[in-house]
From Swiss-Prot:
Record SUPFAM superfamilies: Metallo-dependent phosphatases
Gene behind the chain: fbp
Enzyme nomenclature, EC number: 3.1.3.11
Any one GO molecular function term: fructose 1,6-bisphosphate 1-phosphatase activity
Top-rank taxon, per record: Bacteria
Species this protein is from: Streptococcus agalactiae serotype V (strain ATCC BAA-611 / 2603 V/R)
Coiled coil: none
Reaction equations catalysed: beta-D-fructose 1,6-bisphosphate + H2O = beta-D-fructose 6-phosphate + phosphate
Pathway membership: Carbohydrate biosynthesis; gluconeogenesis
Protein name: Fructose-1,6-bisphosphatase class 3
Cofactor(s) it depends on: Mn(2+)
Principal EC category: hydrolase
Family, per entry: Belongs to the FBPase class 3 family.
Key words, A-Z: Carbohydrate metabolism, Hydrolase, Manganese
HAMAP family, sorted: FBPase_class3
């Protein structure tokens, strides 16, 4: 320990430095805890996610009601002002086009003092240094001056007005308004929790990741779709063809080709050479229109080619990993190639739209030399994409399989269980894992695989694929993934995927208490869970187990909204308690600007704090308390740690 305190003394070489830091940390501990925002299953739907981050899921509007007496500010419309705070660039352009020049200037004059007052109100729960870090360098000094003078002596009004007038003269007012709005947006959410699945069927997971990379404080709990992209970057051929197949299925190849710069030309040529469009592989467009009909056919053929490659590679993996106990999923090996049928649970089914041209009936899982070369070329393209690497690096830096934070347990999928509530076990390398140990194993293997991207069929890389579709995967949560059956078998009984018992057991208070204990959390904590859409229109509720379990699948994917009856949930945890937010579908920014698309549906109080929660009561507060103790020890034994 003496070395630790000697190093600490180098950072604080004078006793007065220690006193200053201790007072600063003690003061921070007495501030209200910052607002945490939980969001899950983003599924590439950038505009809807961006809207919620801009608005703080309605928190900005709610705080504005506390900040002003709007009955006295008759000249300003609350909703109109909110839109300026949410979409400042777009709102300014909209007003400029729809107002006269004089009316537009008058409106800008009215907005700036209001924005300054809002910023001051929103920043009151933070230290000055924290607020200063969020201010734009361009206007930092000016904003600090305006913040200092907004509520002071009326005699200084001319000082305030002179600053604004000069900004008008220099044509900088619009830029200032934009910066003020953006700063307010940042301050409304102190910490963001992304509970998995940034990727999936939506078109812009890359834009979401770019947005998240600019966020000051956040963490990510990986989802099953995230892990397949991480697996592709880690060297898994299976994960790679899977993400291409899904992109083709949902008309999102442009993400791979145009925005990640991954060349698919050889795959396109291969797909055209061996496949032709078939009904089972018609892309799902989620209401979007294709500008070129030929593109539909191409996506159809790419989807077929990658599906067959996936089933071949899957059969190979299952052969080399008997411990995965997935031999019943080697369906490409179980096909009767004489009549193109398959027996599933002792029932023979005729295959539909099954192109076996590239399959050796004597060794169905064997890749042709052309396919091997194709996969190698694709892997090089994936692993040398700088933009993809930037995003995957970020997922590894900020992500984990689960997180314990402020007495809450966050994870995406499930904790695999038996129907009696015992943890399901997964035996690997002679050792059995379950519960928390299982998730720790999965995370260590994911990180090991990414550290060795040149290895394509080692255990760590294969476990990433297991996380996508294995029965004991905490990210999948079902007994089998029936992709093969959904493509090739008409009988929908074969398409069924049985959920792990966890998804029924999580309704029970005692089960959730046991889960919290497994992760060393108190019984009054909460579990925040994503992954499964809540079918509220069928009576399902997102608040379970007497408030211990909170299911917050964001419902952003348009394809799920018709089944759920709404657009999902997010969660706010501030110094007053926990609120569950339900959402309506996001339509467009244009409708937001016109005031016709406010997607916050309802807010439900999950838990109200008895006393206002302070920083000292949080995970960060525990760290600060330890720092204070260390500083106090150094202060009292200052001379003992001289070199």
């Amino acid at each position: 320990m003496s070395n630790f305190y000697k190093l600490l003394k180098e950072k604080f070489p004078r006793k007065e430095d220690i006193v200053t830091e201790m007072i600063n940390l003690e003061a921070i501990c007495q501030l209200p805890k910052g607002t945490e925002y939980f969001i899950s299953d983003l599924h590439g739907e950038y505009d809807a996610v961006d809207y919620l981050l801009r608005t703080g899921a309605g928190s900005i509007r709610a705080k504005l009601l506390d900040c002003f007496d709007w009955q006295k500010i008759v000249a300003v419309d609350l909703d109109d002002f909110c839109i300026l705070l949410y979409y400042p660039k777009e709102k300014l352009a909209f007003d400029k086009m729809n107002l006269s020049a004089s009316a537009y200037k008058t409106k800008l004059w009215e907005m700036i003092p209001l924005q300054i007052q809002v910023l001051k109100y929103f920043s009151s729960k933070y230290t000055k240094s924290k607020v200063r870090k969020q201010l734009s360098g361009k206007f930092a000094y000016i904003i600090e001056e305006l913040l200092a003078e907004i509520d002071r002596n009326p005699e200084k009004k001319s000082y305030f007005d002179t600053i604004i007038e000069k900004l008008f003269e220099l044509d900088q007012v619009e830029d200032l308004i934009i910066v003020l709005s953006q700063t307010i947006q940042v301050l409304i959410i102190d910490h963001l929790h992304v509970v998995g699945d940034i990727y999936d069927r939506g078109r812009y997971p890359d834009r979401i990741l770019n947005r998240l990379m600019a966020f000051p404080n956040l963490d990510i709990q990986w989802g099953n779709h995230d892990v397949t992209w991480m697996g592709a970057a880690s060297g898994s051929y299976l994960c790679m063809v899977n993400v291409i197949r899904i992109a083709a299925r949902y008309n999102n190849i442009t993400l791979i080709e145009d925005r990640y710069g991954i060349n698919l030309r050889r795959l396109v040529d291969y797909s055209r050479r061996y496949y032709e469009p078939l009904p089972s592989f018609v892309p799902i467009l989620d209401g979007e229109e294709m500008t070129h009909p030929d593109e539909l056919d191409l996506l159809n053929m790419i989807q077929q080619a990658t599906a067959i490659l996936q089933f071949k590679l899957e059969a190979q993996l299952i052969d080399r990993r008997p411990e995965f106990q997935m031999h019943n999923r080697q369906l490409i090996n179980q096909v009767n190639y004489k009549d193109l049928s398959i027996s599933i649970k002792e029932v023979v089914h005729q295959l539909k739209d099954f192109n076996s041209r590239c399959i050796d009936s004597k060794n169905p899982s064997r890749l042709t030399s052309e396919e091997e070369e194709l996969l190698q070329q694709l892997m090089i393209a994936f692993q040398t994409s700088e933009s993809l690497k930037k995003h995957i690096d970020f997922l590894f830096e900020k992500g984990s399989m689960y997180l314990t934070y402020n007495d809450n347990l966050l994870f995406h999928g499930c904790i695999p269980m038996h129907s009696n509530g015992d943890f399901k076990s997964f035996k690997i390398a002679g050792k059995t894992y379950g519960g928390r140990d299982l998730l720790d194993l999965f995370e260590s293997q994911i990180r090991l695989a990414y550290a060795r991207p040149e290895k394509h069929d080692d255990l760590a890389t294969d476990i990433i694929w297991y996380l996508w579709c294995g029965e004991n995967s905490s990210l999948f949560g079902k007994n089998a993934m029936t992709t093969f059956e959904r493509y090739y078998v008409s009988d929908k009984v074969t398409h069924q995927e049985r959920k792990n018992p966890y998804f029924k057991l999580r309704d029970k208070d005692d089960i959730c208490t046991a889960l919290l204990q497994e992760f060393d959390l108190p019984k009054f904590g909460h579990i925040v869970n994503g992954h499964t859409p809540v079918k509220e229109k069928n009576g399902e509720q997102p608040i379970k187990a007497n408030g211990k379990m909170l299911v917050i699948d964001g419902g952003f994917a348009k394809g799920y909204q018709k089944n759920t009856g709404l657009a999902g949930y997010t969660l706010i945890y501030n110094s007053y308690g926990i609120q569950l937010i339900s959402h309506l579908p996001f339509t467009s920014i244009e409708e937001v600007l016109s005031g016709t698309n406010y997607i916050i549906d309802t807010k439900r109080l999950v838990e109200e704090a008895k006393d206002r929660i302070l920083v000292k009561d949080t995970t960060i507060g525990q760290k600060l308390t330890k720092e204070i103790k260390d500083l106090d020890h150094l202060y009292r034994h200052f001379q003992e740690y001289d070199d």
